[in-house]
């Protein structure tokens, strides 16, 4: 009888741990949807195009052209490492995201824009995407996360990121 109660307790504890993990990971699953983007981080979506823009940050430079259509955003350009990130020999990972923002400054959709693969030796990459655009999108914003690494016995690593919120 006592063994059964212990097992029931372990079962309940397991369910609680799993529930907590699901809640904790929900931020990664949902991304930044609903979060407020500062006005300085918003790029108003001009109609038509192509329009040329540059987004300079501490660690990357995103140079891009976009054409804004009613239900789609065509965007292409180049991602280049900058600042401290460009001093490392290779990229462990680099992910750049595009965020559609509504008229209230809230993120309504997140789209992956570009990803560099593990051990990529590049410093500049090109991308081209056709992205379904939400009807309520009035501006866009960008964010990234990455890790670069040196070669040799030290193999120093440098993590870098920026979000629009």
Annotate each predicted stretch with a short phrase.
Residues 1-25:
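Sec-dependent bacterial lipoprotein signal peptides
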Residues 22-42:
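Bacterial Sec signal peptide processing site at the extreme N-terminus
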Residues 36-46, 132-134, 138-165:
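Surface-exposed edge beta-strand/loop patches
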Residues 39-70, 78-80:
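Low-complexity, acidic Ser/Thr/Pro/Gly-rich terminal tails and inter-domain linkers that flank the onset
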Residues 78-88:
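Short amphipathic, basic-aromatic surface patches that mediate peripheral association
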Residues 89-96:
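Short coil-to-beta strand junction motifs in C2/discoidin
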Residues 96-102:
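Conserved aromatic beta-strand anchor motif in extracellular beta-sandwich/beta-rich domains
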Residues 106-152:
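Short, solvent-exposed, Trp/other aromatic-anchored flexible loops in extracytoplasmic proteins
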